[in-house]
Amino acid sequence: MARLSEAEITEHLAQRPDWSLENNNEIVRTFRLANFPAAIAFVTHVAFLAEAAGHHPDIDIRYNRVRIALTTHDAGGLTEKDFALAAAIDEILG
């Protein structure tokens, strides 16, 4: 899959305002859940989405906060896959 241009990344980020660009090659969002079990349940849901998409995020859990970072390693940056998975993750919590 082709790496996105800066203009394409900017366009996609406008549609995903809760996500931010870091290091010019990944998008990141931190989710705040009710408690640790809710955070684990959320991560489990993300894991099933990621596995189905064949695209696996970096996930960091800190009690009730979950940080998710998306990039396409084999493309060396962001692709449509990252923004598609970000959209699917956003839908988990409505």
Swiss-Prot record:
This is Putative pterin-4-alpha-carbinolamine dehydratase. Pfam families: Pterin_4a. Its EC number is 4.2.1.96. It catalyses: (4aS,6R)-4a-hydroxy-L-erythro-5,6,7,8-tetrahydrobiopterin = (6R)-L-erythro-6,7-dihydrobiopterin + H2O. Coiled coil: none annotated. Gene3D superfamilies: Transcriptional coactivator/pterin dehydratase. Keywords: Lyase. Belongs to the pterin-4-alpha-carbinolamine dehydratase family. InterPro entries: PCD_sf, Pterin_deHydtase. One of its GO terms (molecular function) is 4-alpha-hydroxytetrahydrobiopterin dehydratase activity. GO terms for biological process: tetrahydrobiopterin biosynthetic process. CDD domains: PCD_DCoH. The keyword Lyase applies. It is an enzyme of class 4 (lyase). The keyword Phosphoprotein does not apply.
